[in-house]
A protein has these predicted regions:
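Conserved acidic residues
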Residues: 68, 100, 148, 160
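Active-site rim/loop-helix segments in enzyme catalytic domains that contact anionic ligands
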Residues: 1-97
Length: 167
């Protein structure tokens, strides 16, 4: 049986999670929380680097952060869709790991994959709690599960605040 985790974090691409909430991950792990990461794509369309290089970087980052696991769903970079098939993939993971908290990309990000990934994860988080949606893994029917909270991260590089601005 898969152990329940406290926080499940989704990113459209490898590196989205670290850039968007790496500090939060470290803090939560230091506070004893269990954390799993899920990249939706391999980032194969990225301008800088390659899917292979990003895989190496995410493996290293995951080890440094001390997360419990990291998965890649292999969705097509640039073409993430909030459709039924994609929702079922996410629902199965939510039901498998039963997180209390889910964190994902910001819904209004200008990058189409980030915005669509956010909508996908939010939709699946709701649907995972519906008893009439049936899912199974390895021929075992999954129980419904809805996380208590869904939060969004915004990479700090997207903000233009300085200390005097916020004080």
């Amino acid at each position: 049986m898969t152990p329940k985790i406290d926080i499940l974090i989704f990113g459209a691409h490898p590196d989205d999670i670290e850039l968007g909430c790496g500090g939060t991950i470290l803090s939560e792990i230091e506070n004893g929380k269990t954390v799993g990461l899920v990249d939706l794509t391999a980032g194969e369309l990225g301008t800088r680097g390659s899917a292979e290089k990003r895989k190496q970087e995410t493996d290293k980052a995951s080890k440094i952060l001390g997360v419990d696991f990291r998965l890649n769903l292999g969705m097509k970079d640039g073409f993430i869709k909030n459709d039924e098939n994609s929702q079922y993939e996410i629902i199965k993971l939510i039901r498998k790991y039963q997180p209390d908290i889910i964190i994902c990309n910001a819904p209004d990000d200008r990058h189409i994959d980030h915005a669509e990934a956010s909508k996908l994860v939010v939709s699946a988080s709701f649907l995972s709690g519906l008893v009439k949606i049936r899912t199974e893994i390895d021929n075992n029917i999954q129980n419904r599960w809805r996380p208590k909270n869904v939060y969004h991260y915004i990479p700090v590089s997207y903000t233009h605040l300085t200390l005097p601005t916020i004080c």
